[in-house]
Amino acid sequence: MTTQFSVAGVELELLRYPAQQESNLQAWDAADEHLLKSLIESEQAAVPTAIINDSFGALSCGVSKLNPSWPLCVETDARTSFLGTEQNHGRNQLPLDNLQWFTSRDTLPENLALVLMKLPKNLSYFAHQLTRLSQVLPAGTRVLVAAKAKSINGALLDIFAKHLGPASASLAWKNTRVITCVSDGKPRPLAKEVTWTVPEYQLEISNLSNVFAANKLDIGARIMLENLPKGDFKSIVDLGCGNGVLGLRTAQLFPEADIHFIDDSEMAVASAKANWARNQLPADKGHFYWDDCMTHLPEEVQPDLVLCNPPFHQGEAITDHIAWQMFLDARRRLKDGGILHIVGNRHLAYHVKLQRLFKNCTTVASNGKFVILQAQKK
């Protein structure tokens, strides 16, 4: 794993969060390099600057390295991005007091002079971010967005034009391009909230823009709902909760239980919390955490059931370390006799990991694509 970042005279040591020494994944990509290189070569840096979708702090550390006093507004939806950026600033002895933190639901300041941004995988979320920028940026403000060259096409440039202003792409460098968009100064309204029902469980659901499965029940969640465990559960964790549909259903099945919703996405946690209220579930039984797995879950929470639909992507990277951390955290936090109940794609072979960690693993259900697995802490 490479940890030494070097571009246009900026030297940094950067690690992903959480640090995975055995991983071959690094904390930045060529798009980060291209964006920072373009900024330095153009000599058009401006303050205050907003940095959006900075995976682990390569951009904010790079800009701070150039001038530690520059005020930076850092926006992220991912808790791991927030924690990774903090750690990488400390690792490179860069100040944190010049950073102002924002989630993707917060309103950015109106005096921004420049925006540096990575293109997210979810284009609905990207449109939401551009729309929010349109509400605060004066006409003429530059927004620089870096992405893989293969992701940039006419349809993407149309998204810029629709939600913020005209845009053009640079020449390719290391298979990436930097798009320059100039705000037209016209504020756009945010998209209306979309709600949908899961009639077989009498649930009404809505998702914010960066939450998986925008307006329907995804296949993995559906098979999970059809195969929830039976028992007398008092403390349940919906780990990687997304819109919270699994936790909502368990609240119906186990009305005496406390349900703890955890996700790396702030929008997911906000969606789960809104859906809890929307479905008129008891306010004192739902608990919500924006966190990296169960890293900061209060010690007094000792679940007897953990439900989990692990992601196998972190941004653009395909990785199983998130699932592995979820399983490790579940084993650490479950009560003796407690159950980890998961759904996953068959090809991911999660049964091997569960057998290794728990010394037991049962196949509860399966179809051509998904498998439901259960392991018990003994």
Curated annotation (Swiss-Prot):
GO terms for cellular component: cytoplasm. One of its GO terms (molecular function) is nucleic acid binding. It catalyses: guanosine(1835) in 23S rRNA + S-adenosyl-L-methionine = N(2)-methylguanosine(1835) in 23S rRNA + S-adenosyl-L-homocysteine + H(+). SUPFAM superfamilies: S-adenosyl-L-methionine-dependent methyltransferases. Its main location: cytoplasm. This is Ribosomal RNA large subunit methyltransferase G. Keywords: Cytoplasm, Methyltransferase, rRNA processing, S-adenosyl-L-methionine, Transferase. Coiled coil: none annotated. It comes from the Bacteria. The keyword Transferase applies. Belongs to the methyltransferase superfamily. RlmG family. The keyword rRNA-binding does not apply. PANTHER family: RIBOSOMAL RNA LARGE SUBUNIT METHYLTRANSFERASE G, RIBOSOMAL RNA SMALL SUBUNIT METHYLTRANSFERASE C. It is found in: Cytoplasm. Gene3D superfamilies: Vaccinia Virus protein VP39. It comes from Shewanella baltica (strain OS195). Pfam families: MTS. Specifically methylates the guanine in position 1835 (m2G1835) of 23S rRNA. Its EC number is 2.1.1.174.
